[in-house]
Amino acid sequence: MIQQESRLSVADNSGAKEVLVIRVLGGTGKRYASIGDKVVVTVKSAISSSNMKKGTVSKAVVVRTKKEVKRADGSYIRFSDNAAVLLNNNDEPRGTRIFGPVARELRDKQFMKIVSLAPEVL
């Protein structure tokens, strides 16, 4: 369960290392984000040689959460960290590589580019 002020690690090579959630997108009173939800984030730490500087505001999609997600077949999936992938204005990933596994739920939410770049889809 990702909410405002949650810190997420970044699972791509956009240059940011850690981000802070400013807002959960998707409705007036939406409080929590899960896998596949879009959030507005600000960069808290970044690689010095990248164009993503500290304080940059961007959109991101949540790709891993510690909170388990129930699937239609009754099984659950959870990850060891909370992670996001940064998006550009066209909702495409800013980076060209994705690190670590991502959930299959991203395919249902039409983030096919992230699914195709990921090394493993669970």
Curated annotation (Swiss-Prot):
- InterPro entries in the cross-refs: Ribosomal_uL14 (IPR000218), Ribosomal_uL14_bac-type (IPR005745), Ribosomal_uL14_CS (IPR019972), Ribosomal_uL14_sf (IPR036853)
Protein's UniProt keywords contain Ion transport: no
Tell me the Gene3D superfamilies matching this sequence.
Ribosomal protein L14
A Gene Ontology molecular function term of the record: structural constituent of ribosome
Protein keywords: Ribonucleoprotein, Ribosomal protein, RNA-binding, rRNA-binding
- GO BP terms in the entry: translation
Q: Name one GO cellular component term.
A: cytosolic large ribosomal subunit
The similarity annotation says: Belongs to the universal ribosomal protein uL14 family.
Role of this protein: Binds to 23S rRNA. Forms part of two intersubunit bridges in the 70S ribosome.
Quaternary arrangement and interactors, per the entry?
Part of the 50S ribosomal subunit. Forms a cluster with proteins L3 and L19. In the 70S ribosome, L14 and L19 interact and together make contacts with the 16S rRNA in bridges B5 and B8.
Tell me what this protein is called.
Large ribosomal subunit protein uL14
Q: Which organism is it from?
A: Cytophaga hutchinsonii (strain ATCC 33406 / DSM 1761 / CIP 103989 / NBRC 15051 / NCIMB 9469 / D465)
Q: Which gene encodes it?
A: rplN
